[in-house]
């Protein structure tokens, strides 16, 4: 399970300059909470690893999947709608296009 901290959304420009690889505790706690909640929904016989990364979610997901030789990427979709997705793009669309492995998008 992977939680990507998108610092562009989580912190101001001033904070971003001073962070340089550091994840503020409140953001890290939020990620851990989300990962733990998701991990409880996965059957115990399935081995999982959890990870919190920093960066652009699109690039982090694709690179991590490639570097760790993922068999499949399963991810959610925010459902931006047709108009918003045209202007804002979509993490799931990017991953679907650039991932080296199959991608399953769940609504």
Model segments located where?
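Small/aliphatic-rich secondary-structure junction motif
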Residues: 1-18, 41
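General small-molecule cofactor/ligand-binding pocket signal
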Residues: 2, 49-53, 104
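Generic structural signal for helix capping and beta-alpha/helix-loop junctions
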Residues: 8-9, 60, 82
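A short acidic, glycine-rich active-site loop
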Residues: 19-33
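Active-site phosphate/pyrophosphate- and oxyanion-stabilizing loops and adjacent acidic/basic residues
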Residues: 36, 40, 93
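Structural beta-alpha unit
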Residues: 40-73
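Gly/Ser-rich helix-loop-strand patches that form or flank binding pockets
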Residues: 63-107
